């Protein structure tokens, strides 16, 4: 037996001692150690599917990290070890030559395609733009920037573009801004920048995820600026993904903001109920998990718009049913998902509410704090009041001061205005906007909680 198999067996044996036999059999036993990707400070594992990958990461990621950090298990490990779990790649038989093939599909995940992307009224525009870009021999728009909240399918659509381009034998580079930075620093230290430039500038499709993280890194922004210019000048397709629109990426150089807006910018909206139900059904089908119709409807209605959280809900129900040897019904689902339905927006600060509203409406926070006749600013101010009344203990006086309102009675009017749009008029736009702002608040509050717990 080779060393890598020994390492995998030793890791799993240690993990088996920490969990119940059923948990080990259903979850951890299916992990495969990936020696090629692993390094001294990071260990990579494969899981057989996306649902199990996400579940093990959330439920057992910390446990695996502790095991690897405290035991050598045949590896030359650093003091602190990170753990990454990915979906196992499908083995494909190539019908073409192998010349530079690995370089042409850098980091593209073949499980994300146009065929398994669930299309609804919330994302149809983004889907059509992405398909046109992927199918065209020359860029129809350049660059393309898709933006929106976490877990709405942006990364899926980016990989779908990459996979379609690969089918046409195009050279594709898909990278996160974090990995772009890491690679940049490595080549800079090794004085091999010519190799770095060749890697990222000689491709047909350059696909960048998390573009907002370029900001605040002058040397990286400078290199990306020149990479962008050369790709654009040579009519190579550039597609960017961000969690906010270019003008709202604080700290990003103006010249990059300008270039991001050269082509077309489209927002990925939160899914409506019908689309959410379609997503839940698809995730169940792909991972061979059978849920009753009423349970799938319950997930769509009560779990947030974040697709990853919906996946997590499906996994949680399935795994708990297996552990308890129980049949899946609505009562089980309600019990298992109780903690996922808690509103993390409770106790939000005024600053977080302001930021969440600003990001959702593509405004700057400073614009919202000043009274304006512009419709989008006026709506934003009303939404800040609405969410502040829902989620903060701040009295009317402090809220009025926060928004520079001289007439404190305006607070009640602004709150009532939003409530009317939601409850009486049932404006689809305002309803969708409310969910997006809540999702952003959840993310901001979760980040704060994680930061505080690490102190």
UniProtKB/Swiss-Prot annotation:
| Chief location category | cytoplasm
Instruction: Give binding positions for ATP.
Output: 151, 153-155
Record key words, sorted: ATP-binding, Cytoplasm, DNA replication, DNA-binding, Lipid-binding, Nucleotide-binding
Pfam families listed in its UniProt record: Bac_DnaA, Bac_DnaA_C
Q: Where is this region: Domain I, interacts with DnaA modulators?
A: 1-75
- Renumbered to this chain, region (Domain II) spans 75-106
Ranges for region Domain IV, binds dsDNA: 322-455
> Where is region (Domain III, AAA+ region) located?
107-321
Keyword Cytoplasm attached: yes
What InterPro entries does the entry give?
AAA+_ATPase, Chromosome_initiator_DnaA, Chromosome_initiator_DnaA-like, Chromosome_initiator_DnaA_CS, DnaA_C, DnaA_dom, DnaA_N_sf, P-loop_NTPase
One molecular function GO term is: ATP binding
From what superkingdom does this record's organism come? Answer: Bacteria
Where found in the cell?
Cytoplasm
Q: Which family does it belong to?
A: Belongs to the DnaA family.
Its biological purpose is as follows: Plays an essential role in the initiation and regulation of chromosomal replication. ATP-DnaA binds to the origin of replication (oriC) to initiate formation of the DNA replication initiation complex once per cell cycle. Binds the DnaA box (a 9 base pair repeat at the origin) and separates the double-stranded (ds)DNA. Forms a right-handed helical filament on oriC DNA; dsDNA binds to the exterior of the filament while single-stranded (ss)DNA is stabiized in the filament's interior.
Q: How does it assemble?
A: Oligomerizes as a right-handed, spiral filament on DNA at oriC.
Record's protein name? Chromosomal replication initiator protein DnaA
The scientific name of the source species is Helicobacter pylori (strain HPAG1)
What's the name of its gene?
Answer: dnaA
